[in-house]
């Protein structure tokens, strides 16, 4: 695991859409993460961690 991935994981725990945005930009992954975070913080975190480590 690189340092960049580690930083993205930390950001995904603090603010899930930010971690996904840094990795993928403003693509569909970001919007899915944003919607999941708005529906509930935990689903947003789980999705962000999954998509970053995939």
From Swiss-Prot:
Name listed for the protein in its UniProt record: Hydrophobic protein RCI2B
Q: Which family does it belong to?
A: Belongs to the UPF0057 (PMP3) family.
Residues that span the membrane, as ranges: 2-22, 32-52
Q: What induces it?
A: By low temperature. Also promoted by abscisic acid (ABA) and dehydration but is not a general response to stress conditions.
Enumerate the UniProt keywords alphabetically.
Membrane, Transmembrane, Transmembrane helix
Query: What membrane topology is given?
Result: Multi-pass membrane protein
Any Pfam family from its record, for instance, is Pmp3
Localisation: Membrane
PANTHER family, alphabetized: HYDROPHOBIC PROTEIN RCI2 LOW TEMPERATURE AND SALT RESPONSIVE PROTEIN LTI6 -RELATED (PTHR21659), HYDROPHOBIC PROTEIN RCI2B (PTHR21659:SF73)
| Highest taxon in the source lineage | Eukaryota
Record PROSITE patterns: UPF0057
- Which Gene Ontology terms describe the biological processes this protein takes part in? response to cold
Q: Which InterPro entries match?
A: PMP3
Which taxonomic lineage does the organism of this UniProt entry have? Eukaryota, Viridiplantae, Streptophyta, Embryophyta, Tracheophyta
A GO cellular component annotation here is: membrane
Give the source species.
Arabidopsis thaliana
């Amino acid at each position: 695991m690189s340092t960049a991935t580690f930083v993205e994981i930390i950001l995904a725990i603090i603010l899930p859409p930010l971690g996904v945005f840094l990795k993928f930009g403003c693509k569909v992954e970001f919007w899915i993460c944003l919607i999941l975070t708005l529906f509930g913080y935990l689903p947003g975190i789980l999705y962000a961690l999954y998509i970053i480590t995939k």
